[in-house]
Design a protein with these regions (language model features):
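C-terminal-of-GTPase-core extension/linker across diverse P-loop GTPases
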Residues: 1-152
Length: 152
């Protein structure tokens, strides 16, 4: 939230430029909406509260594994994972939701330590878009796929 927006006209500020500045400085939360409020006169406070309530509710959503599996196939076909080492072939297996608040998604992959950090962001943003989780923090966990034939 950009507070004290009632002072903006006197400072020569406009929403478009302010949104650009906020998005540039806070790249790590581009999924979060930018809301303009003035606590002094109450402008934008209702929208802020509604957005917070909506984000909280979306954070409690549970997505069935079958839907996640289909979405994951689509994500990978659209943008194949690359290894941070460049030559290792990464293969993703099972995907499931482990918890809510924040929604935590587990992706099984053959070499999780080699998945580039930008692919974490890609998966989180793809999940947000696919399942309407905007304004909701998402946790991505990459786990090693269990090896076939090994006893636990």
């Amino acid at each position: 939230a950009v507070n004290k927006w009632d002072l903006a006209p006197d400072l020569g500020m406009n929403r478009g430029l302010t949104e650009q500045i906020v998005q540039e400085r806070f790249k790590f939360v581009r999924h979060a909406p930018i809301l303009f409020v003035s606590a002094l006169n109450g402008d934008g406070v209702d929208a802020l509260l509604q957005t917070a309530i909506s984000a909280h509710e979306k954070g409690k959503i549970w997505i069935p594994e079958t839907e996640l599996r289909l979405a994951n196939k689509h994500f990978i076909s659209r943008h194949a994972p690359k290894s941070s080492k460049g030559i290792i072939n990464l293969t993703f297996g099972k995907v499931y939701q482990e918890s809510t608040s924040p929604p935590t998604f587990v992706f099984e992959v053959n070499r999780p330590e080699l998945v580039h950090f930008s692919y974490h962001r890609y998966l989180a943003n793809s999940l947000r878009k696919e399942f309407d989780l905007s304004a909701t923090p998402i946790k991505i966990v990459l786990r090693a796929k269990p090896r076939k034939g090994l006893k636990k």
